[in-house]
Amino acid sequence: MTIEALADVVRLHPELALFAAIVFGHFIGKIEIRKVSLGTVVGTLIAGMILGLLFEPEIPDLLKWAFFDLFLFAVGYSAGPQFFASLKREALPQMALAVVVSCTGLAAAIAMVALFRFDPGLSAGLVSGSMTQSAALGSALSAIAAMDVDEATRALLTAHAPLADATTYIFGEVGLILFVTVVAPRLLKVDLRQVAREAEAELQARTDEDDAALWDQAPLSLRTYRLENAELDQRTVHEFERRYAAGRLTVTGIRRGDQLLRDVGADARLALGDIVLVASRRAGVVGAALEVGTEVDDQELLSEPMVRASIVLTRREMAGKTLGELARGAARGLFLDSLHRGESTLPRAMGTRVQRGDVFKLTGSRAAIATAARNLGFIEHDQGRTDLVYLAGGVVVGILFGLLQVRLTGVPLGLGTSGGVLVVGLVAGWLYSRYPVVGHIPEPALRLLSDVGLIVFIAAIGLAAGPHAVQAIHEGGIALFAKLVGAGVVVTLAGPIAGLLLGHYVLKLPPVALLPGIAGAQTTVATLNALKERGGSDVYAIGFTVPFAVSNVLITLWGPVIVACAVALSR
């Protein structure tokens, strides 16, 4: 098949080019140079521009903006609980860090636009690429689409934006990783691994010796033993479990003669000859085996159902407590598999403080899980069903809200449809974390909406920009790329440098909170992953979530702001 024939097929079926851009973009994004890759988003943008140049498919704007709205709503829904939690007094330093980093980045971008006379399209790509926030590219393009210019100018500006984004994105990610993981620790004169160890030790510090009822974090093991140790005769289950507190052992069932006791309470008494079902990590089981008695194969007891559940923390009185405080006296028979806040996995340390909206992945007996749900919030029972009415209604309200405008000195000001959908998504996610009656969107569905919504939008943008990219490159030449790269370096580093100075000298944030806070304020998950890898700990995730949620909103809103600034500076 010739190129001309293939082009005819693509014009008849433009969806071929759309999905081909995603496929090729994946492989382009996987190409590594010194362990640094572009990532799927930028790879798809580049692939889309190439395919758009070759075949010039026509992708309906309806498809592009519909997927982008789904992406924005999913981002807002996920970040909502953390965003509103950042408004609390104890989170104000982290929120201040995010505001300063993102605002400094915007100020640097405006300065670069004024210096190099970038048009609105190049300005939009400069912000989205340098600050690695693809949502800002979409919100800026939405503003460009609303500009009062002819179609040829609008098409050229729309092509300039992804070109600038792809040019500045590489240093936007790599430069921030180097700054946060190498430069900043040297300036602060700290060792990332030592900082992590000290933070973990502080989180694990226990203030109460009665730790028999602390969350177990190890793989679960079930064993049955015949009680043969006379010292344990007539002891309560609570006393028995305290004896093996270091091993975190829980009695979940007893066979006494022909009688089978399930959901055993802590005040139940043991007797010689009982067959005891214990659940524990391996160390606890081994310790019990040495003292309790002979291990037996009681299949009926071993079939005791242990269930897994995701419990969302919604109770106000539990928010702000540490895992140790929650567990003490309330976690018997529960095993904490993981703890999540938004997209971040938190360390399962006794000093980790929880917030409303956090998700506990627990394993335990049905009774223990039910008790935990009453104490913490609610169980996500139907995790496979999405409330489509809530989702679609949220997008509708967001678009209408974004259309509202006020006039300031004759200039119309508003969030725009993109900003409106994002803000409504934030409120929707926050409301669900407080009142989980309607509006459930499971985490896998949110991830799918976010990933597919963004990647389809980026592919469509690339395909539309491809035919005009050659004109932009021809007109600007090497000088344009040099200006973009230089401006991108300034915008990428301006915010983190300001954040480092503010966080260290004014806010007095410890490095374990400051460094991931800078990564979150620049909305770069790759930097957090690099920080956790170099530091050898998940403890850095704690300082990431609040700045990430705040800056996700702010930098997305910077899209139309930078477009407006570029228009004003061009006059």
Swiss-Prot record:
This protein's record includes keyword Transport: yes
Keywords on record: Cell membrane, Membrane, Transmembrane, Transmembrane helix, Transport
Broad class of where this protein is predominantly found: membrane
Transmembrane segments: 10-29, 36-55, 65-87, 96-118, 166-188, 388-406, 411-433, 446-465, 480-502, 509-531, 546-568
Residue ranges of domain RCK C-terminal in the record: 294-378
GO molecular function, one term: monoatomic cation transmembrane transporter activity
GO CC field: plasma membrane
UniProt subcellular location: Cell membrane
GO BP term (any one): potassium ion transport
Pfam families given in the database record: Asp-Al_Ex
Membrane topology of the entry: Multi-pass membrane protein
InterPro entries tied to this protein: AAE_transporter, RCK_C, RCK_C_sf, YidE_YbjL
NCBIfam families named among the record's database cross-references: YidE_YbjL_dupl
PANTHER family linked: K(+)_H(+) ANTIPORTER SUBUNIT KHTT, PTHR30445:SF9
Family label: Belongs to the AAE transporter (TC 2.A.81) family.
Designated name of the protein: Uncharacterized transporter BPP2141
